[in-house]
């Protein structure tokens, strides 16, 4: 069984304010954290934005949400975006008002990370995992942290890591680096080889390598490619690895890209979600230091496509009732 069986539930309070009431598979209304826990989830992932215009996903929002997770006995994985909005391979916008020279930016990043971690510590909330950036394959805190300057990236990541290490959290969270396209070993190898050869960012600065692995953006995203990539990562660097974002659709009438050949027989349904998540979990489990799987935003029913060309990737009906697939976490 995987050590971390998780769900990103960042948007739950946004949905609740919009009137959503979550129900388990039997139609019984409960707070989402208890529905997740009774379905085998043991950790939640939460994204943190620095200063979003509406306050959603900021630090206060996240501390409120984390209290609920802890009350339900769930572990906590904090996913820093280091931006006021979405950060991913196409967007890594430095927060408004942050410094525009690398020395001051590195200090700002250290202090922001330190202060944020101390807020959790002071609230009595244990953080289990922290990712220092989200899908930073093309760098972070642009333009200074773009991949045309690997040394800057290494400096920034070192500063972020030590913001976690110097915090009052005890025990210390595991520190994760998170890239996209986990199936692509060439990408992972290119990125880590460059960043770790610079000097400032050292192997001792972090504990885990996280990857996103989605079926609907490339036919190359096969389970075999994921297995090969994760195995190579572990044999080269020896870190724990996890799939920290994945989805499977219940509806995908107009896919923009071809699905990988090895999952084309998996149906677009709750049963298909169960089958796919079990398959991905089996790959992670087969890797010597494969420790976890996290499903991305299964309860964000007002954004059901979850950014993809598939109509619905959630694990809930439009009225907020859990699908049978949510119980897959008992079996991975």
Swiss-Prot record:
It is an enzyme of class 3 (hydrolase). It catalyses: The enzyme specifically hydrolyzes (1->4)-beta-D-galactosidic linkages in type I arabinogalactans. It holds the Pfam family Glyco_hydro_53. InterPro entries: Glyco_hydro_53 (IPR011683), Glycoside_hydrolase_SF (IPR017853). Signal peptide: none annotated. GO terms for molecular function: arabinogalactan endo-1,4-beta-galactosidase activity; glucosidase activity; hydrolase activity, hydrolyzing O-glycosyl compounds; polysaccharide binding. Glycans are attached at residue 111. Keywords: Glycoprotein, Glycosidase, Hydrolase. Its EC number is 3.2.1.89. GO terms for biological process: cell wall macromolecule catabolic process; pectin catabolic process. The active site is at 135 (proton donor), 245 (nucleophile). Has a pH range of 6.5-9.5 with optimum of 8.5; and a temperature optimum of 65 degrees Celsius at pH 6.5. Belongs to the glycosyl hydrolase 53 family. This is Arabinogalactan endo-beta-1,4-galactanase. It comes from Humicola insolens.
């Amino acid at each position: 069984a995987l050590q971390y069986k998780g769900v990103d539930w960042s948007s739950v309070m946004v949905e609740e304010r919009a009137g959503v009431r979550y129900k388990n598979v039997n139609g019984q209304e409960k707070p989402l954290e208890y529905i997740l826990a009774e379905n085998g989830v043991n950790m939640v992932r939460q994204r943190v934005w620095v200063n979003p215009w509406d306050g959603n996903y900021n630090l206060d929002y996240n501390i409120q949400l984390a209290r609920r997770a802890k009350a339900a006995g769930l572990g906590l994985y904090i996913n820093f975006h280091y931006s006021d909005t979405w950060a991913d391979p196409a967007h890594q916008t430095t927060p408004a008002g942050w410094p525009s020279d690398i020395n001051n930016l590195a200090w700002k990043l250290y202090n922001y990370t330190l202060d944020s971690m101390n807020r959790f510590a002071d609230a009595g909330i244990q953080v289990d995992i922290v990712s220092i950036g989200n899908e930073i394959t093309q760098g972070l805190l642009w333009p200074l942290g773009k991949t045309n300057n690997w040394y800057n990236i290494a400096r920034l990541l070192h500063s972020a890591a030590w913001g976690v290490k110097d915090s009052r959290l005890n025990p210390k969270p595991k520190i994760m680096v998170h890239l996209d396209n986990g199936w692509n070993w060439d990408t992972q190898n290119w990125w880590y080889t460059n960043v770790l050869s610079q000097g400032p960012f050292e192997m001792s600065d972090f504990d885990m390598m996280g990857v996103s692995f989605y079926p609907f953006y490339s036919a190359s995203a096969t389970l075999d490619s994921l297995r090969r990539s994760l195995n190579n990562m572990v044999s080269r660097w020896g870190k724990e690895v996890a799939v920290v974002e994945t989805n499977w659709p219940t509806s995908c009438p107009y896919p923009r890209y071809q699905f990988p050949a090895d999952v084309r027989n998996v149906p677009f349904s709750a049963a298909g979600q169960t089958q796919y998540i079990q398959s991905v979990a089996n790959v992670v489990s087969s890797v010597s230091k494969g420790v976890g799987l996290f499903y991305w935003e299964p309860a964000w029913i007002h954004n059901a496509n979850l950014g993809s060309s598939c109509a619905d990737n959630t694990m809930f009906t439009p009225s907020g009732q859990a699908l049978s697939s949510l119980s897959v976490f008992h079996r991975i």
